[in-house]
A protein has these predicted regions:
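Conserved donor NDP-sugar-binding/catalytic core segment of glycosyltransferases
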Residues: 102-135
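Membrane-interface aromatic/basic loop that binds lipid-linked glycans or pyrophosphate carriers
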Residues: 1, 264-321
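Acidic donor-binding segment of Leloir-type glycosyltransferases
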Residues: 26-65
Length: 321
């Protein structure tokens, strides 16, 4: 087996935690990987941080002339993956998360014939800006199908982030790269779902040990906590796109999703975001969301119920005042 079967790819922009991320890569007990860093025209002097790891990590550093992640994050992911040299497996990581020292070793412990036909997953811890573990989410089952992944994810039984999956290049090429939504909101979820659908073995989680987990950082620099009007509006539009994508996938692969194909609740999740942020939007905007949902997803009942609930709550709120 070649020494560079695994490409670890970091689309980099922020410098705050990059050194800690690279330290975690440098500490890998199994060196059968090559690291690719795609500097998204960052103003934060990333090259100076990266220089300190020359000779410690087998890597390629490339600084792009233009910033792309600010307008199309998925396109930035993909141009960084394009830096790779044909490695059969790709691990898209980040510039602020941390991998356990035995992650690469445990990846190679999965038999090659299994790896070729599965998306490989690591369990995670959630850490804060001080790198303290603040939460340990539920572990994944050892193996789950695309249908089980969808069921567990949308029922809140599991969570997932982009950095906890290693995927075969062959499947990545087959599906045409990442599913692209504005802000990359749900892009990783939809992509893992599609990859699991295309994989004979679905999603397989490596043996859960403390040294083979990924620490995902809940940082003030992430998009997730941003509750501004503009960001929330874009998130909701992307969530409606996510729901439409799931509906299309269920129709395209009915045998893969036989147990959930008729469960309408699997595509009503955009309304949770609308309800949580209803005070940010006018009734006209909420109506536009529901119309968009009806047009692209269907299931008029969900849209009507959501709109009526918000209309009544706003009416009651006005009269309470």
């Amino acid at each position: 087996m070649a020494q560079t079967d695994l490409a670890i790819v970091i689309p980099a922009y922020k410098g705050t935690f990059l050194r800690e991320t690279l330290e975690s890569v440098a500490r890998q007990t199994d060196r059968r990987f090559h690291l690719y860093i795609g500097d998204d025209c960052s103003p934060h002097g990333l090259n100076e941080i990266v220089k300190d790891f020359e000779g410690r990590i087998p890597m390629t550093y490339h600084r792009f002339d233009t910033n792309l992640g600010g307008t199309d994050l998925v396109a930035q992911w993909e141009r960084c993956i394009a830096l790779t040299q044909g490695e059969p497996w790709i691990w898209l990581f980040s510039d602020d998360d941390v991998m356990g020292p035995e992650c690469v070793r445990e990846f190679y412990e999965v038999p090659e014939d299994v790896r070729k036909n599965a998306v490989i997953h690591f369990n995670i811890n959630i850490i804060n800006d001080k790198s303290t573990v603040i939460k340990r989410p539920a572990e994944y089952p050892a193996q789950i199908s695309a249908e089980e992944y969808l069921y567990l994810k949308l029922n809140g039984k599991i969570i997932s982030y982009v950095v906890e999956f290693i995927f075969p290049r062959a499947i990545y090429d087959h599906i045409g790269g990442f599913v692209n939504f504005d802000l990359a909101w749900g892009s990783d979820f939809m992509t893992w779902l599609r990859m699991a659908t295309e994989s004979e073995r679905g999603i397989m989680t490596v043996k859960p040990t403390e040294k083979a987990m990924v620490n995902w950082r809940m940082s003030t620099e992430n998009i997730s906590p941003n509750k501004t009007y503009a960001i929330e509006k874009r998130k909701i539009e992307s969530l409606i796109g996510n729901a439409a994508y799931i509906r299309a996938l269920l129709k395209q692969y009915p045998k893969h999703y036989d147990g959930v194909e008729k469960e309408f609740r699997f595509v009503k999740f955009p309304f949770g975001e609308i309800l949580r942020n209803r005070n940010l939007f006018t009734l006209k905007e909420i109506h536009e969301f529901t119309e968009h949902y009806r047009k692209h997803v269907g299931f008029t009942t969900h849209a009507i119920v959501c709109e009526l609930y918000i209309l009544i709550s706003k009416y009651l709120l006005r009269h309470e005042r």
